[in-house]
Each structure stands twice: as structure tokens, then as C-alpha cells.
A protein has these predicted regions:
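Short, polar/flexible loop-turn hinges at active-site or ligand-entry regions and domain interfaces
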Residues: 55-56, 152-156, 231
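Calmodulin-binding IQ motif helices
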Residues: 39, 168, 243
Length: 253
């Protein structure tokens, strides 16, 4: 007998829906800004009409790596010492100690900034922040994968990783921190060239530098507000798989 596969998807909600000219600030996460960048139509259906996007599957192994890296870097944070990864990479910095760090890392809280012209409360949960010898904050993002080739951030789909880092840099700057354009991806690549599993996966760890440019953020916020305030649903995006799927399915209704 086949087991029943249950889904947690709830297509329609009544909360966290944008209303034009609302007085209360509208909370918008970094991931929702990325959703707008990918498809204005799907974003509008979600944030303006309350039709949830279909969620992806959780990457629990990645989450475990993320949590363990945070604990590991926190040990060096407490001692105000650089992690050996940083020393080996020649990075003159230490993990940054700040009373709000745990909030900055917390999902649905994160670093927040109220953008008064748009009435948007923008936020994003970071993985880590380091502080350079010059006193600038360095945004750090943890990534985990398993591939035969050496990791890099050059694939077209990884542009979203770069925007993610740039958005965090922008949030910190809006909170009056001095932030370096250069951030780092702590990229963990699970090794496959072992004879057996033996209850563990070993990783190669690379620190990949990236020089961000957050100039796009303010312009994007303006476009988001314009999108949310319009009454017409944006046209389907030819780059969006969900839109393409919907366009095919609708022919049979």
C-alpha cells in the first residue's frame, strides 16, 4: 500500500499582504526581493494577492553545515582571534563581535532597515560578519555542496548568491556601519573520492572573495513599490519556469 504524501503548501493566505497606501510599514525580506528580481508576476501574486509560491524542499544537510560553521567561528569570535581558514587565506580580519549578532542571524528578523520613502521594512538574516584591520565590516555567507569540480561562483544561477551578499552589505550600510565592498563565501564541498561513508562526510573548504556593488538595491526598491501599487497583475516572465508551466497548463482549462 502506498503511503499518503502530505504537503504543507497553503496556496492562499490572509496575512502579510501588501495594501496600497497602507500606513503600517510592510515587511519585506531579502528572499522576497530576490523573488521580485526573478519574476515580477510571481512576486505580485505572492505579496499583493496572498497566493503563496510553491516552496522548495529544505536542504537539511546544508543547514547542519551552516549551524556548525557558526559555532566554530563563534569560538574564535569569543577569543577575538582569526579562524585558521582566514589565516591561511591571508585575510587580515577577525570574526566580528556585536550584541545584535544573534538577531542578525535569526530568520524572519535579521538586520533590519525601515526605508521611509517606500514604507518598506527590509530585512535579511546573515551567516556571519568579520571585521577588518581597517575597521570595516566584511559580509560572509556560508555555502555547502558536493561536486567533483572545484567550487566557484561563476555560474549564471549564482548571480543570486552575489545579490544576496550585496543586499546584506546595503542593509549594514543603512544602519551606519562601515562596510567593505569585499565579502567572502565560505564554500564547503563534500568529498566523493572516499572508499566508504563511515558515518561522515569530509569537506574541502574554500574562501571565495567577491567584490559587491549594491547600487541596484535602491532602484529595485522603487520598482518593487511601483509593482505593488499597481492594480494589474504583471505579465508572465518568459524566464520564469512557474510562468511557463502555468501558460502550458491553462490551455487545458
Amino acid at each position: 500500500m502506498l503511503g499518503l504524501i502530505m504537503t504543507e503548501y497553503k496556496p492562499k493566505r490572509s496575512r502579510n499582504i501588501y495594501s496600497p497606501n497602507q500606513e503600517k510599514p510592510f515587511k519585506l525580506s531579502r528572499s522576497k526581493v530576490e523573488s521580485f528580481m526573478k519574476c515580477e508576476r510571481c512576486f505580485y501574486l505572492d505579496r499583493r494577492l496572498g497566493i503563496n509560491q510553491v516552496p522548495g524542499f529544505p536542504f537539511n544537510i546544508n543547514s547542519a553545515v551552516d549551524e556548525l560553521l557558526k559555532r566554530e567561528f563563534d569560538q574564535y569570535r569569543e577569543r577575538a582571534e582569526p579562524h585558521p581558514y582566514m589565516v591561511d587565506a591571508g585575510i587580515n580580519a577577525i570574526p566580528y563581535q556585536h550584541e545584535q549578532l544573534n538577531k542578525w542571524r535569526e530568520n524572519f528578523v535579521g538586520i533590519q532597515y525601515f526605508h521611509e520613502p517606500s514604507n518598506l521594512l527590509l530585512h535579511g538574516a546573515i551567516d556571519d560578519v568579520w571585521k577588518s584591520e581597517e575597521g570595516e565590516l566584511i559580509v560572509v555567507d556560508y555555502k555547502a555542496t558536493s561536486k567533483k569540480d572545484k567550487v566557484n561562483i561563476n555560474a549564471p544561477w549564482q548571480r543570486s548568491y552575489k545579490r544576496q551578499m550585496e543586499f546584506y552589505q546595503w542593509l549594514l550600510r543603512q544602519n551606519d556601519f562601515q562596510v567593505s565592498n569585499r565579502g567572502y563565501f565560505v564554500y564547503c564541498n563534500g568529498k566523493r573520492n572516499r572508499d566508504a561513508f563511515n558515518e561522515k562526510v569530509e569537506f574541502d573548504v574554500d574562501l571565495l572573495p567577491y567584490d559587491g556593488n549594491d547600487d541596484w538595491v535602491d532602484t529595485t526598491i522603487e520598482k518593487i513599490v511601483t509593482c505593488l501599487n499597481q492594480d494589474e497583475i504583471p505579465n508572465p516572465d518568459e524566464r520564469c519556469d512557474q510562468c511557463k508551466y502555468n501558460q502550458e497548463v491553462i490551455q487545458y482549462y
